[in-house]
Structures are given as C-alpha cells and as structure tokens.
Design a protein with these regions (language model features):
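Conserved beta-strand signature within the Rossmann-like core of class I S-adenosyl-L-methionine
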Residues: 149-157
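A short glycine-rich, Lys/Arg-flanked "PGG" loop and its adjoining helix->strand segment in the class I
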Residues: 137-148
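A short acidic, Gly/Pro-enriched loop at the edge of an enzyme's catalytic core
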Residues: 113-123
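Residues lining the SAM
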Residues: 126-127, 155
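Class I SAM-dependent methyltransferase SAM/SAH-binding core
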Residues: 61-112
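Conserved SAM-binding loop and adjacent beta-strand
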Residues: 30-46
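Class I S-adenosyl-L-methionine
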Residues: 177-208
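N-terminal, positively charged/glycine-rich alpha-helical extensions of SAM-dependent methyltransferases
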Residues: 1-27
C-alpha cells in the first residue's frame, strides 16, 4: 500500500471510514512516515529550542497525536508532562506502547472536547489541520484549552491556508492570540511525491 495511504486519508470525506483507514495503516504508519522523511518532529524541536522557552515539566497537549512520533522527540528533549489526544483507537494503542505520554485521550478535534479550558502550557497540532481530517473551526478549541500566555503551535499546508479557511479563522481570533512567528516553508514529507509545502504557525494566548 505504501505511498497510497497518504492520498487515501487526505481525500476521505467520511470520519467513520477515516478511522477505519487509520486502523488498517496503524501498524506500518511509523515506518512509512519515517521513510518519507517526516519533518514535523524536527520542526517542533527547533521551535522549542529557539522560539519559545518552557520548562521541562510544562503541560503539553499533543493534539492529533497519532502514534506519538512528535512526542518521541519531546521525550528525547526531557519533556515529561505530555497529554496525547487522537480520534484513532488503533493509533493510540501504538502511542501507549511507547510509554511517553502521561495520559492518552480518544476524542475528535472536529467538535468540542471534554478537556478543561485554559490548562495547557503548549498545544501542538501537527499534520492534523488539513484536508480530510480536521477543519479550521478546531482552532477555537485549541485556543480554548491553551493557558493564558501559553503557546499554540500549528502546522498548516500553504495550499489550504486560505482555501480551507485557516487564515480567516486565525484572523478572527486575533483578540485571543498574538503571533510569535511563522516559519519558512518546508516540505513535510520530502520523500513522498504527494507531500505539500507547510509552515509552522506559533501563537501565544493573550491574557483573558
């Protein structure tokens, strides 16, 4: 199946079928993304080393955590208070086996979660805000659970930033968040022919 999985999950319109696709892909997901040069862990590491300064016990939400590839890098950096949230039970099983999360939650970001408001020092959402997955409205939910003065780190493909309403949703929430930095474009999966150019968007939640 290999490289076809990415096209399948990004073009799927049904959330039920999307969950089934990830169930079927879960066992090979890590190997596939590593083979494709998965860039988000490195991008997140750069941000946490250069753009924002947080303590190693900071409470971090890995929103749309999948199998925990980004959290593995966080763990290597000695962050020890990571909460993972994902829609796929099968992806979460693999994430749990890595023993790098303090807690794992099976929920969708496409609607309001059960997470308490204003609780995370950092909210990460990489490779999730995209076609076939989670739309722009989820940005409101990600802001809601971020602490005052906490950080929101999002990856968004350039091709959908305006087209799918992410630019508009971020601008509508300017009263809640201030821009820290937007990265230079990078290819999220450089070894996959379908990969798009993305940017990392870093915001800080304003005092409420």
């Amino acid at each position: 199946m290999g490289k076809k999985w990415l096209d399948i999950v990004y073009n799927e319109k049904s959330s039920v079928r999307l969950k089934e696709h990830y169930k079927n892909w879960a066992s090979k997901y890590d190997n596939d993304l590593i083979d494709w040069g998965y860039a988000y862990p490195t991008q997140v590491k750069k941000i946490l080393e250069s753009n924002i300064k947080i303590k190693r016990n900071s409470k971090i939400l890995d929103a749309g955590c999948g199998t925990g590839l980004v959290a593995e890098t966080l763990n290597d950096m000695k962050f020890n208070n990571i909460i993972g949230l994902d829609y796929s039970v099968d992806m979460l099983k693999i994430a749990k086996s890595k023993k790098i999360y303090k807690k794992l939650i099976q929920e969708s970001l496409s609607k309001k979660t059960t997470l308490r408001s204003n609780q995370f020092d950092v909210v990460l959402c990489t490779g999730v805000l995209t076609s076939g997955h989670v739309g722009a409205k989820a940005i409101n939910e990600l802001i809601r659970v971020t602490k005052d003065r906490g950080y929101l780190i999002l990856s968004i493909a350039e091709s959908i930033y305006e087209k799918l309403g992410f630019k508009n949703e971020i601008e509508k929430n300017n009263f809640q968040i201030s821009k820290v930095k937007i990265s230079k474009p990078f290819i999220a999966l450089p070894n996959h022919e379908s990969s798009a150019t993305s940017k990392m968007h870093i915001y800080q939640r304003r005092l409420t």
